[in-house]
């Protein structure tokens, strides 16, 4: 009897031991239009409007920073539960961790947002839904 219980316990625990069933999906963000390899790419995913659209002003955004290695890059966010999200990217050319803007708030460094809306970013035009794995494309814009 003990052997049957031990075998059952092992078989039942096998998916967890192998890492199967990790909650949430993977968001793959394909970024294009990066004008040079100076600095780094800051990519973030917002689950709510708090701090949107600036990664650094949000306490709830998931942020990744990567060294730029070409005109296009791919960033992955894992373990995202189903729901509404907005993704944002910034080309931090001087690597200071801040988005440079002019005196009226227009970015001096490259920026991009999910759904690639023109003009001032709005949550409604940038939001997308995830129900598992998803891939989006963001084009970096420089003004």
Task: Give, region by region, the residue ranges found by the protein language model.
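Short proline/glycine- and polar residue-rich coil/turn motifs
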Residues: 65-71, 129-130
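A short tyrosine-centered beta-strand micro-motif
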Residues: 83-89
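Acidic, divalent-cation-chelating loop motifs in proteins
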Residues: 90-94
């Amino acid at each position: 009897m003990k052997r049957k219980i031990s075998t059952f316990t092992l078989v039942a625990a096998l998916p967890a031991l192998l890492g199967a069933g990790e909650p949430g999906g993977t968001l793959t963000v394909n970024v294009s239009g990066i004008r040079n390899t100076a600095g780094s790419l800051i990519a973030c995913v917002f689950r709510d409007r708090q701090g949107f659209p600036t990664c650094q002003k949000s306490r709830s955004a998931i942020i990744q920073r990567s060294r730029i290695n070409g005109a296009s890059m791919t960033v992955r966010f894992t373990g995202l539960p189903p729901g509404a999200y907005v993704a944002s990217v910034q080309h931090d050319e001087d690597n200071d961790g801040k988005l440079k803007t002019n005196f009226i708030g227009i970015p001096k460094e490259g920026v991009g947002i999910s759904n690639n809306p023109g003009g001032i970013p709005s949550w409604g035009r940038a939001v997308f839904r995830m129900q598992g794995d998803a891939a989006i494309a963001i084009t970096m814009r420089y003004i």
